[in-house]
C-alpha cells in the first residue's frame, strides 16, 4: 500500500489562516499590528522571489511589511546601522536578514546585531542557546515547519525514534532540539555518518536535510515511517527545463513509508507560514500580551 502524501500546501494555508485570525483579534482588542522587516542585500534572483513571497503573505495575514533593499556592495557598517534602526522601531516586531549575504559581509556579526526578541529567523546565538537548553525561544522557521508537518501525522512524538540527516545551524541542529523538546529519541547524522541506511531503518521519523538529491533510498526506510524531506535540488528535465527534487527518492519512499512530504509542496510551504507565526509571537511577547493560540 502506497504511503500518504503530507500536503504542505494545505497545512501551511491552514496555519496562515489561523495566524490571520489571531492578528485580527489583537488588532481589535489591543490596537496592535505586528510588523515584519525584511532586509535584502544584493539582487540575487532567488532571494528576490523569496522576499516578494514573504511580503505578499505578511500583508495577507494583516501584518505590516517593511522591505529594505541594499546594494550588494553595501558596507558592513551600513547594514549594522539599519539593523540598529529596526531594533529601535516600535512598529517592527520581527527582523529577517535574507541569506545568503554577499561576500565581504560578516553574516554572524549581522545576525548577532538583531535584537533577540525580534529575531524571527531564530538564528541569534541567544535564541539558539535557549533552544539548546530546552527553554522557550524563537525557533528557526524550517525546523518548526517540520515539527508541524510531523504532528499532522502523529498526535504525539513522545518515545518515537527520529533521525535527522543534516547538521546545519539553519535546519539540522535546531530540529534536533525541537524533537528532544517533544520527547522523541533522536539520532543526528550527516553525509559522512557510517551505516547511514541502517540508522535510517531504525527510525519512525526520518528528516532528510543534507542537500544531496535522492540520497535517501526506499530500502533505507522502516516500513510505515514518516519521512520529512527538507532538501531541494534543481535538476534538468525534458525540453531544456528544470524540476525540483528532494533528498529522498520520492517514488521509492512512497512504496515503503507511511507518510512522505513531496518536493515541491512540502516543507518549503511551511517556512514562510512559520515566519508569520514567529512574527506574531514576537509581537505579543514584546507588547506584553499572552502568547497567541497558533
Swiss-Prot record:
Its EC number is 1.5.1.5, 3.5.4.9. SUPFAM superfamilies: Aminoacid dehydrogenase-like, N-terminal domain, NAD(P)-binding Rossmann-fold domains. GO terms for biological process: L-histidine biosynthetic process; methionine biosynthetic process; purine nucleotide biosynthetic process; tetrahydrofolate interconversion. Pathway: One-carbon metabolism; tetrahydrofolate interconversion. GO terms for cellular component: cytosol. GO terms for molecular function: methenyltetrahydrofolate cyclohydrolase activity; methylenetetrahydrofolate dehydrogenase (NADP+) activity. PROSITE patterns: THF_DHG_CYH_1. Belongs to the tetrahydrofolate dehydrogenase/cyclohydrolase family. HAMAP family: THF_DHG_CYH. Catalyzes the oxidation of 5,10-methylenetetrahydrofolate to 5,10-methenyltetrahydrofolate and then the hydrolysis of 5,10-methenyltetrahydrofolate to 10-formyltetrahydrofolate. NCBIfam families: PRK14186.1, PRK14188.1. This is Bifunctional protein FolD. The gene is folD.
